[in-house]
Amino acid sequence: ALSRVCELFDSPVIHVGGDECRWEEWEADEALMERMHDQDVTNGADIQRLFLSHCAAVLATFGRRLAGWDEIVGMAGKDLPADALVLGWRENGLGARDARASGRQWVQCDADLLYLNRLAGAIEEEPTGMNGIITPQRISEELPSLLNGERLIGVQAAAWSEFLTTPDLLFYHLFPRLLIVAEVAWHGEAALPWSEITPLVEEEIMTLQSAGIPCRPLT
């Protein structure tokens, strides 16, 4: 399957996931564990480690680079390819901590600040979204301090779709917050302060709305 992905897509980086893996489901499968025993694999963690190694080997034959969530750092250990790209998503700085410590290039994806499917304001005032409030102002004020560290090469915002059931709802969650993410990602710690970025974002909101794209009010 991974070979087919490489045939279909010419991206130099292929993301293989690696997060939130329920090892106990594998470990409860007697036939699977018996098969894995022949490869000296005795638990779910080792199965995932073997899978990651296999993915890395397949991607290498196609000249592609493996990417995965920050859990792959502890999972693969020394077997993690030197050119692997680590995406640090876990909250409370845990993802960034492990991504930074991996010695590999990494991307800041902190769920506390960059998961734009989360509410943008008080729950009673917002449409359906994931719990955890990320206001536009929070992004402006807090994201610059997260954009430091050796080998950090970029920022990724996400909008997971469990609650985003229509295009309009997706746009509402994305804008204007994604505009602020882009501003801060481009300028880093030199990004404009909230008071100065506000009028610029308001102009962009009007541009988007004139194109028929629904946006949440900035404040």
Residue ranges and their predicted role:
Residues 65-73, 78-84, 89-219:
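Flexible, acidic glycine-rich loops studded with aromatic residues
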Residues 1-84, 89-103:
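Active-site neighborhood of glycoside hydrolase catalytic domains
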